[in-house]
């Protein structure tokens, strides 16, 4: 049953693509490199990104939600700059605050280490973390290693604004 929730049928995909072609969507957010739109009447959104590296990661993730559980499920990539993903919920304020504090501490750690360190290098020195955040970071590290993208752990955009909730679990929605 879990895998069915993470998959998208061809019929669902075609319906979403038709709605995108017919401009049946609503703008919901913009970030540094792109814009996100809610597809009318669907629990899916699509993103148009100007960041080639971000798009290349989406290409790796497409139809692999069961393998990469810490990333938002990617259902479709268009071969250019658009991809369709699940619609997720906002990160609760308490988790957002704890992740922001973790990142503030990481910034000090990074400076002390002279840069070129990842959040995973910091994890053993982070002190006591919320178990939900610690478990997410451990699983995220495993997923990033499975991606096989050289130095992605140093380059990905880990911050609370890029994490949302899907089915009660944290997922990266931007990277």
Model-predicted regions and their roles:
Residues 24-83:
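ATP-binding glycine-rich loop module of kinase domains
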Residues 1-25, 128:
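Juxta-kinase regulatory segment immediately upstream of eukaryotic protein kinase catalytic domains
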Residues 132-157:
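ATP/nucleotide-binding catalytic cores
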Residues 148, 152-175:
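Catalytic activation segment of kinase domains across protein kinase-like and atypical kinase folds
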Residues 1, 69-70, 171:
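Non-catalytic localization/regulatory regions flanking kinase domains
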Residues 54-56, 92-96, 167:
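Short catalytic/ligand-binding loop motif for oxyanion handling, primarily in non-cytosolic enzymes
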Residues 68-138:
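Conserved structural core of kinase catalytic domains
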Residues 48-50, 86-87, 174-175:
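Residue-level recognition of conserved beta-strand positions in structured domain cores
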């Amino acid at each position: 049953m879990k895998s069915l929730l993470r998959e998208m049928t061809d019929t669902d995909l075609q319906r979403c693509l038709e709605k995108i072609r017919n401009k049946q969507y609503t703008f919901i957010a913009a970030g540094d490199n792109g814009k996100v739109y809610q597809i009318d009447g669907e629990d899916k959104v699509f993103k148009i990104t100007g960041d080639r590296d971000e798009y290349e990661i989406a290409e790796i993730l497409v139809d692999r939600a069961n393998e990469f559980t810490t990333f938002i499920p990617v259902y479709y990539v268009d071969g250019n700059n658009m991809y369709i993903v699940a619609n997720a919920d906002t990160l609760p304020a308490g988790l957002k605050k704890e992740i922001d504090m973790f990142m503030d501490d990481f910034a000090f750690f990074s400076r002390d280490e002279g840069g070129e360190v990842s959040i995973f290098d910091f994890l053993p020195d982070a002190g006591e973390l919320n178990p939900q955040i610690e478990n997410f970071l451990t699983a995220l590290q495993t997923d990033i290693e499975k991606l096989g993208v050289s130095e992605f752990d140093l380059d990905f955009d880990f911050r609370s604004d890029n994490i949302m909730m899907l089915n009660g679990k944290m997922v990266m929605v931007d990277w």
